[in-house]
Amino acid sequence: MTEIINVTAREILDSRGNPTVEVEVAVGTGDVGRAAVPSGASTGEHEALELRDGDKGRYLGKGVRKAVANVIDEIAPAVVGLDASDQASLDARMIALDGTPTKSKLGANAILGVSLAAAKAAATAHGLPLYRYVGGAGARTLPVPLMNILNGGAHADSNVDIQEFMVVPLGLPTFAEALRCGAEIFHALKKVLKGKGAATGVGDEGGYAPSLASNEEALAVIMEAIGQAGYEPGKQVALALDCAASEFYDKKAGKYELEGEGKRFDGKGLVEYYAQLAAKYPIVSIEDGCDEDDWATWKLLTERLGGKLQLVGDDLFVTNVTRLARGIEQGVTNSILVKVNQIGSLTETLEAVRMAHRAGYTTVMSHRSGETEDTTIADLAVACDCGQIKTGSASRTDRIAKYNQLLRIEEELGGSGRYAGRSAFKALR
């Protein structure tokens, strides 16, 4: 019934105007699944390889014709005839066909497109929404949105070093109310920034990207916006940071340099800097607080703040079970960011989530800075019982599409659904 009968692919554009891969998989029932692959701006060194053409005369070298050709000429002949409902076998076939540790032969973007499209085709063939097909009957938890309303670092052209400042509406009763809260704070922040004469253009993920004096000023204006929107900081709304510390780490010197503030820290100093921010503001989560290979400072940070805050490994773990296992063994961080394109297949993504949950780590489903209208991660957040999702601000349709899908899922679940709220954060339980 769900035998794969056709696989095709094309080059489309993502939210930054860069090419990406879109795949369609057709199964014997006549159902078709379609998936578009996202792309990151600040990417971890240990991520699976996103295959680009490298032809500078076309899309500045960022074309994906090679990956598209690999889907059509290499992957399709190998998977036609397989059962799309057997996700593990399908993904294993593609991984074996590639034969490299980072999927560099066929491209993680090629493999992932087929992996996700096949899952969507199978779900439709079985008459199930994707979250129910992947997550089973127990998939009913709506995630807390970590809404990136102010951008810095690699996501914006400004002197704010920390990459993302997020509002976390954890004290609301439903996902719909949490989303409304985040949107109202987003609009209030625009007024606050305008009042200070700051720019209100938005970055890659829909958050404002003003040039502010310091990271702390960014936190201060968000706190002001929360109050102006009529919400209570700490009780109804908390804050989260994605520091993307690998972007401001000097590997040769072993120092972290916040150029916008003129500050330079060793690992111990950086941990103290975060501790001071957490003491002053209602921060519940810090992502990528240290460099992706600075395990020693990660250990210091976990020992200092791991009992109070969620410490999320993104570039550190890259949704990879080998790196995650090392983190668990060393007692580093207490949470993992989940990005399907970091590892390049649905099966491996689900394995990482299961490993994290077994170890008592929280999981945060995440978008990338280069997105499309594809809403797969909204369903996966519910399917995987992540409890949290990062999918940008309350602007840009590529971000809003995911939030709207979660609104639909909440409506469909009705009384059986629950909003994760504060319970999504282990330190707050």
From Swiss-Prot:
Pathway: Carbohydrate degradation; glycolysis; pyruvate from D-glyceraldehyde 3-phosphate: step 4/5. Mg(2+) binds at residues 242, 287, 314. Binds a second Mg(2+) ion via substrate during catalysis. CDD domains: enolase. Its EC number is 4.2.1.11. Its cofactor is Mg(2+). Keywords: Cytoplasm, Glycolysis, Lyase, Magnesium, Metal-binding, Secreted. It holds the Pfam family Enolase_C. GO terms for cellular component: cell surface; extracellular region; phosphopyruvate hydratase complex. GO terms for biological process: glycolytic process. (2R)-2-phosphoglycerate binds at residues 163, 339, 368-369, 390. It catalyses: (2R)-2-phosphoglycerate = phosphoenolpyruvate + H2O. GO terms for molecular function: magnesium ion binding; phosphopyruvate hydratase activity. Its main location: cytoplasm. The active site is at residues 205, 339. It is found in: Cytoplasm; Secreted; Cell surface. It is an enzyme of class 4 (lyase). Catalyzes the reversible conversion of 2-phosphoglycerate (2-PG) into phosphoenolpyruvate (PEP). It is essential for the degradation of carbohydrates via glycolysis. Belongs to the enolase family. This is Enolase. It comes from Anaeromyxobacter dehalogenans (strain 2CP-1 / ATCC BAA-258). The gene is eno.
